[in-house]
């Protein structure tokens, strides 16, 4: 397995629409494993393939839950060629962050419950009603496959302030090296 570089805003590749995964081969399995390793190291709870420069409809999620001893219990989930449909009108506000928009967080309103269809890493089809944090995370990562970032859900003013702060912090980090 290998750590992959994570693209950060304003990289234009983050705005690309991802294409359907058609071949479920060893290369895909390696990419999935590398994406999990990269996500865990970052650390994060979700990662879309486009965030590591691969414009395929693939995302990985792990909503790691700490156990009593403090160790995180891994629950890796792979979603290939996902399709999401909101269920009902209820929305949920969640403070989101993104590995491609480092150290920046903002509240985003998304449907509380979704119906999801996807393929797993072996190409098997699944369909499930999903709610809670997994629904939020899945919608966030799904946006990446369409070239959308969580900051696009913010007002222009909030987005501008967040980007200004991000670029200032990035410059400070670069100047300290």
Swiss-Prot record:
Give the intrachain disulfide bonds: none
Enzyme Commission identifier(s): 3.5.1.88
Detail which positions bind Fe cation. 98, 140, 144
InterPro entries assigned: Peptide_deformylase, Peptide_deformylase_sf
- Enzyme active site: 141
> Catalyzes what?
N-terminal N-formyl-L-methionyl-[peptide] + H2O = N-terminal L-methionyl-[peptide] + formate
**Molecular-function GO terms, alphabetical:** metal ion binding; peptide deformylase activity
Q: Which Pfam families match?
A: Pep_deformylase (PF01327)
Q: How is the cofactor bound?
A: Binds 1 Fe(2+) ion.
SUPFAM superfamilies assigned: Peptide deformylase
State the function annotated in the UniProt record: Removes the formyl group from the N-terminal Met of newly synthesized proteins. Requires at least a dipeptide for an efficient rate of reaction. N-terminal L-methionine is a prerequisite for activity but the enzyme has broad specificity at other positions.
Instruction: List the PANTHER family hit by this protein, alphabetically.
Output: PEPTIDE DEFORMYLASE (PTHR10458:SF22)
For this entry, the protein name equals: Peptide deformylase
């Amino acid at each position: 397995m290998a750590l992959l570089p994570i693209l950060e805003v304003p990289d234009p590749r983050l705005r690309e629409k991802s294409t359907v995964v058609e071949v479920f081969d060893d290369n895909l399995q390696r990419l999935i494993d590398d994406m999990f390793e990269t996500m865990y190291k970052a650390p994060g709870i979700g990662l879309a393939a486009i965030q590591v420069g691969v414009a395929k409809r693939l995302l990985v999620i792990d909503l790691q839950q700490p156990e009593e001893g403090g160790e995180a219990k891994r629950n890796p989930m792979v979603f290939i060629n996902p399709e999401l449909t909101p269920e009902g009108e209820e929305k949920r506000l969640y403070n989101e962050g993104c590995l491609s928009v480092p150290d920046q967080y903002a509240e985003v309103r998304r449907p509380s419950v979704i119906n999801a269809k996807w393929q797993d890493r072996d190409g098997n089809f699944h369909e499930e009603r999903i709610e809670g944090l997994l629904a939020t995370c899945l919608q966030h990562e799904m946006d990446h496959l369409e070239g959308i970032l969580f900051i696009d859900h913010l007002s222009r003013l909030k987005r501008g302030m967040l980007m200004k702060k991000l670029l200032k912090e990035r410059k400070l980090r670069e100047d300290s090296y």
